[in-house]
Design a protein with these regions (language model features):
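N-terminal secretory signal peptides that target proteins for export/translocation
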Residues: 1-6
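Cyclophilin-like peptidyl-prolyl cis-trans isomerases
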Residues: 20-203
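Bacterial N-terminal signal peptides
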Residues: 9-21
Length: 203
């Protein structure tokens, strides 16, 4: 074999394992990380301003997954915070609140299914997001609340799944809205949309 041909063959033989290893590594990385959803946040756009919440999938994976799914479907868009108790929490996520004629039934709506409770060690402090439910621990669906005070008596009895990282002033504004019978706000507090976005897109 000519010297040049021999050198070329040796070079190809040396490089092939390198290319193969690089391709294999890239395929493994793609397989292991098809889509990074652990670093996502929720942008809760309301008639009073925007709030941004981070998630706790390490302690409430199914709850976080359900909330993100509903948000991506536009389920929460056009709903309202229908129950407000200053110093305690603001509650929303009921699809019935899209219809003013169903006001008497507000607080009873759901997505048509229930999810299992994921009680955990996260404490209910100001800004924490948690799932609303009935007396049945496994009755949460879509309704959630954001703590205004520090209702730690709810710990390990309600599924905390995230907390606000921006918009505390909006929480304060909503929580101090004047209310009437049934803790209903006297003016409508719209949830215009809830969008799931990468955390690094938030400034």
């Amino acid at each position: 074999m000519p010297l040049i041909g021999m050198k070329l063959s040796i070079l190809i033989a040396m490089l092939c394992p390198v290319f193969f290893a690089a391709a294999q590594l890239g395929a493994e990385e793609k397989k292991e990380n098809p889509m990074n959803t652990s670093n996502e946040v929720a942008v809760i756009k309301t008639s009073e301003g925007d709030m941004v919440a981070e998630f706790w999938p390490d302690v409430a994976p199914k709850t976080v997954e359900n909330f993100k799914k509903l948000a991506r479907q536009g389920f929460y868009d056009g709903t309202a915070f229908h129950r407000i108790i200053k110093g305690f929490m603001i509650q929303g996520g009921d699809p019935l609140t899209k219809d003013e004629s169903k006001r008497a039934s507000w607080g009873m709506g759901d997505p048509g299914y229930k999810i299992a409770a994921e009680f955990n060690e996260k404490s209910h402090r100001r800004g924490v997001l948690s799932m609303a439910r009935s007396n049945d621990p496994n009755s949460a669906g879509s309704q959630f609340f954001i703590c205004h005070g520090d209702p730690t008596f709810l710990d390990r009895q309600y599924t905390a799944f995230g907390k606000l990282i921006k918009g505390d002033e909006v929480l304060e504004k909503i929580a101090t809205t004047k209310t009437g019978p049934g803790d209903r706000p006297l003016k409508r507090i719209n949830v215009e949309s809830i969008k799931i976005v990468p955390a690094d897109s938030i400034k």
